[in-house]
Amino acid sequence: MSEPESSVANNDGESTQAPQLAELTLKNVLGDIVNGVHFIIFDPLGNRFVVPVIILLTSIITKVIITKVPYTEIDFVTYMQQIQLVNQGEIDYAEISGDTGPIVYPAGFVQIYQWLYSQTNGGADIATGQSIFGYLMTATVVFVCVAYTMSPTTKPWVLFLLLGSKRLYSIYVLRLFNDCFTTAAMVGVTVFLQQGSYWYSTSSFISFLFAIVGADLFSIAISIKMNALLYLPAVVIIAYFLVGENILLFAIVLAIVPLVQILVGWKFLLPLFDDEAASQIRWNYINNAFNFGRKFLFKWTVNWRFIGEETFLSDKFSILLMGGHIVVLLFFIFTRFLNSKVTGKSIWQLIKDAFKPSSTISSNNKLIDYNVGPKLILLILATTNVIGVLFSRSLHYQFLSWYCWQLPFLLHSTGWNFIVCLVLWGAHEWTWNVYPSTVASSLVLVGILSSVLVGTWRNEAVWFEENNVVDDEKKNE
């Protein structure tokens, strides 16, 4: 005999059938578990639950590592020795050095580490320094999650990869490298430029303000470590469109970058003095902090071990890398970043419009479309940076922090199968945990970075589609 169906009365007094609950069986319970797991791995709507978990786990993991894993001194003592000299009044970069060498970073680095100097009792209180870097890593993850979820089709598994790098935790809380602050600043730049894209349709002036703040923070990133310059082409392109292709507003945004450099480096640049001593101090600052000809030691390279030391140290190899960087970057710029399907107009029209004083941006420009613009901005910044990383003269172990935050998103942007992406992520992590690097590890690293860039370029859907429909991506799960 079947169970009678229950009924309830609605507001009009009419009887309606109550919804039937699924029968409590092992099969149904297992089905719910499978659906839940699928939701928090593949469904973009799951990000609202996954993001808080990612942030919480990052905070917990950093604290556990600080407690359980011994700190390793590499450069922090040297940083503190250099800062001590600055605090004592030394402003000549030629006279500022520590145990592992002279100061080689701009004035933003000095100001940040002066603050760390004050918080850690001159570097003696390492535990406090580690805690600060732990909070920095957690804050960086917060903003990375914001940047990722500004793209509505980012799947949760991409966010989970942010937890997966052993080397990255080491760079932050066991080494205390200044690269971490540059990375945090550039993640901030990404979010501000994404916000400029999102709000453009509401107010172009708000978008302009976000571009200003982004340029300010970009210059601060450069003042900490000049690897942030790798982003320059992307920042310039994005800023140009966020001000509506208005050349006058664009000039204002660009002017922010050198202005901030002057203000941050004021006491080392001595702009109000023109005597011989001031000129020498100014030159020493510029030459040490922004030395593009710096030589790297072969024993520390992570990416070029397979080419041999003689080739690595040769000027021809350096020129080859520079040429490759320029060619690949221009290829991406003209075939993807400035493609008419993105900008709404041809390259030739863009050039002609650039000489007009008023706004000339196309209404079809995807970079100012709140639906897809934030995703494209992250994509352009990430690919530009990773191209620079691929052709870097050398990658040292702390340099992983330059781009590790972007790799999960780029893997997702290739459109490759989920399992393939996980395997590549694992292989990439392996290359950074082999010490010292080997021929095999460096070959795999260069191969993965090259493959990800090729895969991202080939996936036209991620660049040109009006809206990425989640259902269309299920075949890649």
UniProtKB/Swiss-Prot annotation:
EC id? 2.4.1.258
Which residue ranges are assigned to the Cytoplasmic compartment in the record's topology?
Answer: 70-131, 194-203, 244-247, 338-371, 428-433
What GO molecular-function term can you cite, just one? dol-P-Man:Man(5)GlcNAc(2)-PP-Dol alpha-1,3-mannosyltransferase activity
This protein's pathway: Protein modification; protein glycosylation
Q: Please name the GO terms of the biological process aspect recorded for this protein, alphabetically.
A: dolichol-linked oligosaccharide biosynthetic process
Location in the cell reads:
Endoplasmic reticulum membrane
Transmembrane segment boundaries: 49-69, 132-152, 173-193, 204-224, 226-243, 248-270, 317-337, 372-392, 407-427, 434-454
Q: Does the keyword Hydrolase apply?
A: no
* InterPro entries in UniProt: Glycosyltransferase_ALG3 (IPR007873)
Quote the catalytic activity from the record: an alpha-D-Man-(1->2)-alpha-D-Man-(1->2)-alpha-D-Man-(1->3)-[alpha-D-Man-(1->6)]-beta-D-Man-(1->4)-beta-D-GlcNAc-(1->4)-alpha-D-GlcNAc-diphospho-di-trans,poly-cis-dolichol + a di-trans,poly-cis-dolichyl beta-D-mannosyl phosphate = an alpha-D-Man-(1->2)-alpha-D-Man-(1->2)-alpha-D-Man-(1->3)-[alpha-D-Man-(1->3)-alpha-D-Man-(1->6)]-beta-D-Man-(1->4)-beta-D-GlcNAc-(1->4)-alpha-D-GlcNAc-diphospho-di-trans,poly-cis-dolichol + a di-trans,poly-cis-dolichyl phosphate + H(+)
The family classification in the record reads:
Belongs to the glycosyltransferase ALG3 family.
Described purpose of this protein according to its UniProt entry: Dol-P-Man:Man(5)GlcNAc(2)-PP-Dol alpha-1,3-mannosyltransferase that operates in the biosynthetic pathway of dolichol-linked oligosaccharides, the glycan precursors employed in protein asparagine (N)-glycosylation. The assembly of dolichol-linked oligosaccharides begins on the cytosolic side of the endoplasmic reticulum membrane and finishes in its lumen. The sequential addition of sugars to dolichol pyrophosphate produces dolichol-linked oligosaccharides containing fourteen sugars, including two GlcNAcs, nine mannoses and three glucoses.
Write down what this protein is called: Dol-P-Man:Man(5)GlcNAc(2)-PP-Dol alpha-1,3-mannosyltransferase
The organism named in the record is: Scheffersomyces stipitis (strain ATCC 58785 / CBS 6054 / NBRC 10063 / NRRL Y-11545) (Yeast)
